[in-house]
Amino acid sequence: MAGGPPKALPSTGPQSLRDMPHPLAGSSSEEAVGGDSTPSPDLLMARSFGDKDLILPNGGTPAGTASPASSSSLLNRLQLDDDIDGEARDLFVTVDDPKKHVCTMETYITYRITTKSTRVEFDLPEYSVRRRYQDFDWLRNKLEESQPTHLIPPLPEKFVVKGVVDRFSEEFVETRRKALDKFLKRITDHPVLSFNEHFNVFLTAKDLNAYKKQGIALLSRVGESVKHVTGGYKLRSRPLEFAAISDYLDTFALKLGTIDRIAQRIIKEEIEYLVELREYGPVYSTWSALEGELAEPLEGVSACIGNCSTALEELTDDITEEFLPVLREYVLYSDSMKGVLKKRDQVQAEYEAKLEAVALRKEERPKVPADVEKCQDRMECFNADLKADMERWQSNKRHDFRQLLVGLADKNIQYYEKCLMAWESIIPLLQEKQETK
């Protein structure tokens, strides 16, 4: 990305929080509340901000004698853990093979989605369909409508700044493909979202547009109820555990935004330094043509600088393509979680308003109406699902950032090792010239 113009694209489930019982899964509301072993918000916050949040597998101790080999073996070990976890899965989805389509009215990219599963919900063991970005967007909207109590993974941002990024370049398409692949894999790993009817159709239907026009697939009972909740109810006070989650998400997004801005400034400076290196190296090469005895050492210095510039370009590309997208994904993730929190607050506000209205009735034998009980069920459902998704999100976050930071360290080690080898390679040449004198 740092060197030359962009290449053109050729045309053509985890358990819930502490196994917490769902309030609508057959147990009474009292049992669900009484048997709740959910960690306190302070514990969640400690997991998030404490040393365990982004701790490295080696305990976080400085590795003064670390080498690229040791860091690479660490990456391999993390990958092995993923393979072991994957042995228990029964649904695998992959996004690959992007293709550019040029039509009269528009130009767009489609991606091949390959699905392999042993679930009874699928008629065939394997499916292969092609989808474009707007199909992914449709899926996410449908999941939000039908599963409002759950955290829906974010999609990569659709729009890019015109003139800054070519959305049909090979680099941009590959970055988006990785993001879309991660989006589907997060849904696949979810114990509820992966069984959603819309998700099944998205993975299997040859003609998705026909399904969209039919407008079938009714909303769930909980989803339909939440959809009709108006914003006319005012929440008195948010429970402490959810207030702590909201505060954490605000701080988390702020920190990631700061890291993203600083990383982009570093990349900009590295690109400027790379331009200078590319002009600096050839100077020694042209100088060598004017020298006799110094010609070979000068050519060696020129080649050394060229190797260093290549290593720097690789490091810059890795940070741009691997590091920054993860930061932006989790900023969007925190926004999605805030959206679910707001929906939960609306349901709680509705429940409080209805409960207060019942209390104001002067009856000898007050009886809680059915609609109030249903509203209470929805609120407890929201609480349980949100807590479970928050724990799942925290677990994924720790895993993703562990891999991200280990990978960043590994790439930096490789960069400095390459520069060291390049400069060390010309030392014998310079010593040889000194001895000949």
Swiss-Prot record:
The keyword Iron does not apply. Heterodimer; heterodimerizes with SNX4. The keyword Hydrolase does not apply. Residues 89-210 form the PX domain. It comes from Mus musculus (Mouse). The modification Phosphothreonine is found at T38. A 1,2-diacyl-sn-glycero-3-phospho-(1D-myo-inositol-3-phosphate) binds at R132, Q134, K162, R176. Coiled coil: none annotated. Residues 1-45 are annotated as: Disordered. SUPFAM superfamilies: BAR/IMD domain-like, PX domain. GO terms for biological process: positive regulation of autophagosome assembly; protein transport. Belongs to the sorting nexin family. GO terms for molecular function: phosphatidylinositol binding. CDD domains: BAR_SNX30, PX_SNX7_30_like. It is a peripheral membrane protein. One of its GO terms (cellular component) is early endosome. Residues 234-437 form the BAR domain. The modification Phosphoserine is found at S40. This is Sorting nexin-30. Its main location: membrane. The lineage of its organism: Eukaryota, Metazoa, Chordata, Craniata, Vertebrata. Involved in the regulation of endocytosis and in several stages of intracellular trafficking. Together with SNX4, involved in autophagosome assembly.
